[in-house]
C-alpha cells in the first residue's frame, strides 16, 4: 500500500538527497507485460529486492478487531472500548482491523470483482488509462516508468478522489475507457464514497482514542480533504522469495483503509520481525500513515508494511489513502504538545510539501517523515541566516 516515489530524491529543492538518474530504463509501463513475464523461466533481475527486504514472515500478527457498530450507533460504552483497543494498536505498530463498518451489502465484493474486470482487459485497453508522469490517476505495470530496479511485481490503477459532485473517479475512467466501460467507474466511485465516509468516522474514533477534548478534531480537519484510491493486482510469481508486490514502506498519507481478497500477502513489521496480516471476511485493514503520525505528535506509529507475492495465486487489494487539503498546515492539537513548542516532534508542513517530496523521485520507506522533517528544518535555518 504505497504512494510511490524513489528512495532518493531528484527534486531540485531537496539537495541533501540528490542522486543521478539512470540514462536509460530497461522497461516502461507500455512494455511490462506480466502475462509474458510469467511464461519466462526466471523473473527479470529488475524485480529482485535486497535480502533484508524479502526476509520471510515469522508468523501471524494478532491484530485487534474493532467492531464499529457500537460507535456508529452512538453507544458510548462500546465506543470507549473500541477507542482503547485502537490506541493500543496504534501505539504498538499502527494497524488494526475494523468490522461492521457500515458498507452497503455486497459493495466490497462488487468492487473486487470490477477490479478483476479491469485488470483482465487487454494490455492495449488498460493502457488507455495510462498514468501520465506527474499525475496521480492512471494505470501502471511494475512502476518501471519511474524506477530501474527493485520493481514491484504488480499492476496498479490509481485514482484521485475528491468528494463530489463532480464524480472525479467515474469521470476519469469513463473519459479514458469509454462509455461501454462505464460500470467500472460507477462501482469504483461508489466504493470511494463509502471509503471516504468510513475515514471520517475513523478520524473521530482516533480523536476519542487520544483523549482529545474535541473528539471531532480530526474529522473536521479532514472534511475538506481528498483521497487516493488504488487497485492492486499481484500476478503469480515464479520466484516469490526474491520479488515483492510492494516493497517495505510507510504510507506518507494520513490513514489507509485496505480491502484484501482471500489471498495472503500483507505483512507488517512489528516487534522486530515481519508478520502476516491474514485476510478476514468482512474486515478492513486500517493503517496509520506518516501524516497522521505527525498530527498525533508521534504518539501513534506509522505502519511499516509490505506486500509479498506467491507462485500460484493472483492477489487483489483495494486501498484508500486519506489526505488533508493540500494547503492545510499539519500541526497536532495543542493538548498533545503539552504547551511546550520544544515538545513538538515534527515541524509544521503541508500535505502539498510532503506529497511533492514523495512524488519527485523519493521512494517512500520507514525514514520518509524523518528525512522530510530534517530537510524542512535545514531549509528554514538557511533562510533565517
UniProtKB/Swiss-Prot annotation:
Q: Which residues form the Fe2OG dioxygenase domain?
A: 224-324
Its pathway? Plant hormone biosynthesis; gibberellin biosynthesis
Q: How is the cofactor bound?
A: Binds 1 Fe(2+) ion per subunit.
Keywords, A to Z, come to: Iron, Metal-binding, Oxidoreductase
Q: Give, as one word, the top-level EC class.
A: oxidoreductase
Q: For Fe cation, which residues are the binding ones?
A: 249, 251, 305
Q: Name one GO biological process term.
A: gibberellin biosynthetic process
Its catalytic activity? gibberellin A12 + 2 2-oxoglutarate + 3 O2 + H(+) = gibberellin A9 + 2 succinate + 3 CO2 + 2 H2O; gibberellin A53 + 2 2-oxoglutarate + 3 O2 + H(+) = gibberellin A20 + 2 succinate + 3 CO2 + 2 H2O
Tell what triggers its expression.
Answer: Not controlled by the level of physiologically active gibberellin.
Q: Which residues form the active site?
A: 315
EC numbers, comma separated: 1.14.11.-
GO molecular function annotation: gibberellin 20-oxidase activity; metal ion binding
Cofactor(s) essential for the protein = Fe(2+); L-ascorbate
Q: Which tissues does the record link to its expression?
A: Expressed in 3-day-old seedlings and siliques. Detected in dry seeds, roots, old leaves and inflorescences.
To which protein family does this belong?
A: Belongs to the iron/ascorbate-dependent oxidoreductase family. GA20OX subfamily.
Instruction: Name it.
Output: Gibberellin 20 oxidase 5
Q: Gene encoding this chain?
A: GA20OX5
